[in-house]
C-alpha cells in the first residue's frame, strides 16, 4: 500500500500510496516529544493508540459533516488519507485556560473562554512556531482572506463536534490544535491527526489529565491514559 517515504515528523511517517497518486499512508510512531523536541521518549503501543483514536474521531467528524483528509484505517498503526498540501498554520482552539496562555497573558488557570478562543501559530520549527495574527498569516502563507475565514469557521465547527464527542464519554475538551491542507481540487480539509497528542483532555469528574501533558509534566503513564481515551471512545462512539 505504501511506496516512497515522503516525510518523517515527530509522531508520524508519511508515505506515498502505491495505489493512488492522490493518497498517502500515515504511519504512527511510538515517539513522544515535548517542549519543541527538547524532551523525547518512546512508548511501546503509542502509535497504535493514536492511530485508532484519530481514526475513530475522524469517522465521527465525517458523520457530523466535516470534511477531513481521512479515508480509512489500514492496520493497527497506519491509515490512508487524501494527499493535501499542508498550510503552515496551527490553529489552536481554547475552551479553558491552561498551559502557555496562562503564562503569556496572566489568565487564571481553568478560566472558561466564551466564545472559545482561537489562536494562529506559524509552523516553523526554527522560529519555535510563533503566535501570529491574521495579517501575518496572509503574509507568511499563500492563503487568501476568504480561505483564512474558512479555516477559522471549520476549526470552530470541529470544536463544537469534538466537545459533543468528548462530553459523551465524560471528558472536557480543554484545548487542541488543528492543521489544514488543500487536496488536488483545492478543497481545504482538516488534516494531520486528532488525538491525545494534539488535544488537552480532562476527566469531567476528577480533572485528571488524559493527554500528553502526563508526559510533559511527568505526572503519569502516557500509555495508560491514551488507552483510557480509546476505551471510552470504543464504548460510546
Swiss-Prot record:
Protein keywords: ATP-binding, Ligase, Nucleotide-binding, Purine biosynthesis
Gene3D superfamilies reported for this sequence: ATP-grasp fold, B domain (3.30.470.20), Phosphorylase Kinase, domain 1 (3.30.200.20)
CDD domains, per database record: SAICAR_synt_PurC
Pathway(s) per entry: Purine metabolism; IMP biosynthesis via de novo pathway; 5-amino-1-(5-phospho-D-ribosyl)imidazole-4-carboxamide from 5-amino-1-(5-phospho-D-ribosyl)imidazole-4-carboxylate: step 1/2
A GO MF label: ATP binding
UniProt key word Nucleus: no
GO BP term, pick one: 'de novo' IMP biosynthetic process
Reactions it catalyzes: 5-amino-1-(5-phospho-D-ribosyl)imidazole-4-carboxylate + L-aspartate + ATP = (2S)-2-[5-amino-1-(5-phospho-beta-D-ribosyl)imidazole-4-carboxamido]succinate + ADP + phosphate + 2 H(+)
InterPro entries in the cross-refs: SAICAR_synt/ADE2_N, SAICAR_synt_PurC, SAICAR_synth, SAICAR_synthetase, SAICAR_synthetase_CS
Pfam families: SAICAR_synt
Entry annotated with the keyword Nucleotide-binding: yes
Record EC number: 6.3.2.6
Identification of the protein by name: Phosphoribosylaminoimidazole-succinocarboxamide synthase
